[in-house]
């Protein structure tokens, strides 16, 4: 092996799965040193490695499940947390977390993270997570909070506003976009997607709101093409915005071209739907251009099926524990060894971490909105429901509820940091072969 040219050795190692690469470290001292100490090898290997799968309850949970790449087993890799956790996004090796309502950006591979001075209670679907690769070894992140507001003067139009955070503070973008009224899609398959510099939110009518956090330009992307009614998933594949349209018979993959046109790039026969009878529920959960994940729920349990686009084959990826609730968020996770601007080691984060606090003052409302809110309620309108039962009203910026004193007292800095470290440790343990 010592006589083998380094570039040939790298090509061999790059094609190994994580488990096999870990075994290679034990065969030769020089290979072990090369894998563990050469940063260029790490950057290249993690750029080629396949995606792992994270999933957690959509309403938050103290248990996070992780399915590492190329390891054949059930979804047994899980970790208990001290606090309620949500995963709000996963992009380029980073994860955006909400720990008891406190936002945190973390890189599980490098074990660096950062808390943001903002607490989120509800409306997590409206948060977009963007990560840019500045150079081979450096990344930076941005978080965008989108709000929707029905126009009082024209109830057939909706206006969107954007608030941006780069790690230090929140700023209100001067950009707004007004378009035909339709609410942002919530619930299943509603997570925003970041690709080619733009964050994308799917609306109920199938159109997409796009916003560039760097240029602060917004646009509406239409998706009116020949697709049958079915399940929709907004995602990214081969560095293009992708829309999955799935029925019991076929799963169609559409990609957005640079000219704004959608093209059909893949047609997949939905074989697994008919193999999982009696079937209670199914849905397309994730896609990255290389694989497609479909979840099937039957009377005997819940199973994730994986379609390999290169091999054109379906296979069972794993089963989900029976104690997991049906409504779950799934994220494909691809680790990154890059240094991220703003992320810190644990000893520095402990000092900078914000305690849960009341929310900042809401954004100023447009004058016509103030006038509308102070107008007398017409007699024909029903009396408002109690706050606990009322439906959320359109606001210029949906403001999360502040934590109560009791909740603040029960959430300590050490507990929140412990939960973040446990999440990163769950992923990092699987990839410890290279650290």
Curated annotation (Swiss-Prot):
InterPro entries given in the database record: F-box-like_dom_sf (IPR036047), F-box_dom (IPR001810), SCF_F-box_component (IPR050796)
Coiled coil: none
Kelch repeats: from-to residues: 192-238, 280-335
SUPFAM superfamilies: F-box domain
Disulfide-linked positions: none
Domain F-box residue range list: 1-49
Domain of life (superkingdom): Eukaryota
Swiss-Prot/TrEMBL keywords: Kelch repeat, Repeat
Family matches, as Pfam families: F-box (PF00646)
Entry protein name: Putative F-box/kelch-repeat protein At1g20790
Organism: Arabidopsis thaliana
């Amino acid at each position: 092996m010592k006589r083998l040219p380094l570039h040939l050795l790298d090509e061999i190692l790059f094609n190994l799965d994580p488990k096999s690469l870990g075994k290679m470290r034990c065969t030769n001292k020089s290979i072990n040193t090369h894998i563990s100490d050469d940063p260029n090898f790490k950057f290249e290997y993690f750029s080629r490695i396949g995606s792992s799968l994270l999933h957690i309850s959509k309403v938050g949970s103290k248990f996070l499940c992780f399915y590492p790449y190329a390891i054949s087993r059930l979804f047994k890799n899980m970790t208990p947390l001290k606090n309620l956790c949500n995963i709000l996004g996963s992009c380029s090796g980073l994860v955006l977390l909400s720990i008891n309502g406190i936002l945190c950006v973390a890189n599980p591979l490098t074990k660096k993270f950062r808390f943001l001075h903002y607490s989120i209670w509800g409306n997590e679907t409206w948060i977009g997570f963007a990560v840019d690769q500045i150079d081979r070894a450096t990344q930076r992140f941005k978080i965008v909070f989108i709000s929707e507001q029905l126009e009082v003067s024209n109830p057939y139009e909706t206006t969107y506003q954007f608030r941006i955070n780069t790690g230090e503070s929140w700023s209100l973008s001067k950009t707004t976009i007004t378009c035909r009224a339709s609410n942002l899609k919530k619930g299943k398959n509603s997570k925003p997607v970041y690709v080619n510099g733009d964050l994308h939110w799917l609306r109920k009518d199938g159109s997409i709101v796009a916003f560039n956090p760097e240029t602060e330009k917004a646009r509406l992307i239409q998706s009116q093409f020949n697709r049958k009614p079915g399940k929709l998933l907004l995602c990214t594949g081969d560095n293009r915005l992708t829309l999955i349209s799935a029925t019991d018979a076929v799963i169609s993959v559409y990609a957005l071209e640079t000219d704004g046109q959608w093209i059909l790039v893949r047609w997949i026969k939905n074989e697994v739907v008919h193999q999982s009878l009696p079937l209670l529920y199914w849905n397309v959960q994730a896609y990255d251009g290389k694989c497609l994940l479909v979840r099937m729920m039957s009377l005997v349990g819940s199973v994730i099926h994986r379609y390999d686009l290169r091999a054109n084959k379906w296979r069972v990826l794993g089963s989900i524990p029976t104690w997991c609730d049906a409504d779950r968020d799934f994220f494909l996770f691809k680790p990154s060894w890059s240094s991220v601007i703003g992320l810190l080691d644990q000893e520095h984060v402990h000092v900078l971490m914000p305690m849960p606090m009341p929310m900042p003052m809401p954004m100023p409302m447009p004058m016509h909105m103030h006038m509308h809110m102070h107008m007398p309620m017409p007699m024909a309108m029903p009396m408002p429901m109690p706050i606990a039962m009322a439906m959320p009203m359109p606001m210029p910026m949906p403001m999360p509820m502040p934590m109560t004193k009791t909740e603040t007292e029960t959430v300590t800095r050490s507990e929140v940091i412990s939960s973040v470290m446990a999440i990163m440790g769950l992923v990092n343990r699987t990839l410890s072969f290279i650290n």
